[in-house]
Amino acid sequence: EQDFPGNMTAKVTYTLDDNGEVAIAYEAVCDQTTVANFTNHAYFNLDGHDSGVMEGQKLELHASYYTPVIDSKAIPTGELAKVAGTPFDFREMKEIGRDIEADDTQLRYAGGYDHNYALDKADGTMQLAARARGAKSGICMDVYTDCVGIQLYTGNFITPQTGKGGVQYDRRHAFCLETQYFPNAVNEKNFKSPVLKAGDTY
């Protein structure tokens, strides 16, 4: 597919337990060495799907660095930039929209946040990567992963559409937290490689 080498067999397992925890597990093998970087692109609005813009909801990311992008095509430069002193600092919980309109080149490229964060604890074990909280509902969501990165996307390109119960969904009505290898890692030597060798299991 899309000229990637090999024939890959992939499996995704979704598990919902009695505590309301959702687990997503990926497994893949390929008969040739190829690139494997699976993620999840679910949209969240912790105040409910009919609550409109989610910018008042709060987010904490366990990441001291992020990967700036070259331009609006969102390909990382290869740099790991400190979040400290920038609108990208979510190390302490803050409203997602607090700095989203800041005069910042990176935010202008994406029309908001659509950037990968380098997780502070990325040793291959399951770690708490993010915590989000609804502004009105008080619902709290924790995100755990064994990946090295997490992409924050603030729904900047959601176009008006009719959703559940006839509710109109629009720009920034939801956000995504996508655990992953860093984008374009296959071309950046200082990023952890997403290459899956033939016969190995992802």
Where in the sequence are the language-model features?
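An exposed, glycine/acidic-rich loop-and-rim segment of catalytic or binding clefts
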Residues: 1-202
